């Protein structure tokens, strides 16, 4: 940081402030995590200098023999982790991985059956404000009002009625195990392809703590951060027979040069995911989520679906007469970072919401376990009970900071 602070103190100070925020606060945003020093070193390496349009062994630039090594390592490790024939590690994000799949198997105007964003889906699963909702005809399924779980009967009925070309499974705010085999059976019945977006649960899948979609889906996409604990980026997994088309849709279809420094960092993270400690880490993520959910439930909070099977929980604050926006602000003042989130059958604007989403990957990476979740849960309950009590929120913030600074950002 010395050289950066000397050359550009404005940017350098912003980074230092962010280090302080991450170190002194509790990160409970379910889609965020902390990476190892090795991953950061790969991402900050001289590979950022290199243009490498194309794929290993078939580039449009010279001098790619060493970045080819890095990309091939990433591909082979991804295939080993997830037991698949094909992996494309070039997508810059999960959204671009999804776009690559859509362009590989759909034409503009084709029908997609995806999960409603307010029920836990994702923007790229057909939201009208996203490219997926602009280019394609989208039909949405959701969760059952009584259980908060995916309504598979509704999925099947909508599939039979609308005959989608593609069914999209996967979510950004769904706390329960997804039945990928059932989705595939529905897709086969109506002649649709199945894409699973496992961005949130990829790390759990890699470690065996969530059933894998790879054997059921025609296409599987993911981010490489979140529970997979790598750099921010995307990836597509499939069978070898889909490889040529998928490759061409990523490059030259929607991207130019791949980010070779990020791909190298992906390779490092995938190497970490193949180690025994990664499986232990993922178990702790799930155990911590269950412990935190237990604290909140005992305090009278309503969790969508009644709990969690994975790394996240969705807290419906309707009965507490607190909006998601107000809860997010109060928790931030208390040193706890979350995001406001819509809940199924939402009545408020997405800028206000009735819920917050909480996740345990980042705190688990710092070395926290179930005992620490008891403390964290207590602070969450206290802060939400005192959203307008600035004095108490400041007191909680001081307690949180003293606690948080006992843990490194990366303990695994």
From Swiss-Prot:
Site label Plays an important role in substrate specificity, positions: 225
Main localisation: cytoplasm
TM ranges: none
First-level EC class: transferase
EC id: 2.1.2.1
GO molecular function annotation: glycine hydroxymethyltransferase activity; pyridoxal phosphate binding
Highest taxon, organism lineage: Bacteria
Complex formation: Homodimer.
Protein name: Serine hydroxymethyltransferase
Classification lineage: Bacteria, Pseudomonadati, Thermodesulfobacteriota, Desulfovibrionia, Desulfovibrionales
């Amino acid at each position: 940081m010395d050289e950066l602070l000397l050359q550009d103190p404005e940017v350098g100070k912003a980074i230092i402030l962010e280090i302080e925020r991450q170190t002194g606060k509790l990160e409970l945003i379910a889609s965020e995590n902390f990476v190892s020093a090795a991953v950061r070193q790969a991402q900050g390496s001289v590979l950022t200098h290199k243009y490498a349009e194309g794929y290993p062994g078939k580039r449009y630039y010279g001098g790619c023999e060493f970045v080819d090594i890095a990309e091939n390592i990433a591909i082979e490790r991804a295939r080993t982790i997830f037991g698949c024939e094909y992996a494309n590690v070039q997508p810059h994000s999960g959204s671009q991985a999804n776009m690559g799949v859509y362009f590989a198997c759909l034409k503009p105007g084709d029908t997609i059956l995806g999960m409603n964003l307010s029920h836990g889906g994702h923007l790229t699963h057909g939201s009208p404000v996203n490219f997926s909702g602009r280019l394609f005809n989208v039909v949405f399924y959701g969760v059952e009002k009584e259980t908060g779980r995916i309504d598979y009967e509704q999925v099947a009925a909508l599939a039979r009625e609308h005959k989608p070309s593609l069914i999209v499974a996967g979510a950004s705010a769904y706390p329960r195990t997804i039945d990928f085999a059932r989705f595939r059976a529905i897709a086969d019945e109506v002649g649709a392809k199945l894409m699973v977006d496992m961005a949130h649960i990829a790390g759990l899948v890699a470690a065996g703590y969530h059933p894998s979609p790879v054997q059921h889906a025609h296409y599987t996409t993911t981010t490489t951060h979140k529970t997979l604990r790598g750099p921010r980026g995307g990836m597509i997994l499939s069978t070898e027979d889909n490889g040529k088309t998928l490759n061409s849709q990523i490059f030259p279809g929607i991207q130019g040069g791949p980010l070779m420094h990020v791909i190298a960092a992906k390779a490092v993270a995938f190497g970490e995911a193949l180690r025994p400690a990664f499986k232990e880490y993922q178990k702790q993520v799930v155990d911590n989520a269950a412990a935190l959910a237990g604290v909140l439930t005992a305090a009278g909070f309503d969790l969508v679906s009644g709990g969690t099977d994975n790394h996240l929980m969705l807290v419906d604050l309707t009965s507490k007469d607190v909006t998601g926006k107000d809860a997010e602000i109060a928790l931030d003042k208390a040193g706890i970072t979350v995001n406001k989130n819509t809940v199924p059958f939402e009545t408020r604007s997405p800028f206000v919401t009735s819920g917050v989403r909480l996740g345990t990957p980042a705190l688990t990476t710092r070395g926290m376990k179930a005992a620490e979740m008891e403390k964290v849960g207590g602070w969450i309950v206290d802060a939400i009970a005192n959203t307008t009590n600035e004095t108490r929120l400041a007191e909680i913030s001081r307690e949180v900071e003293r606690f948080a600074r006992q843990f490194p950002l990366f303990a695994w």
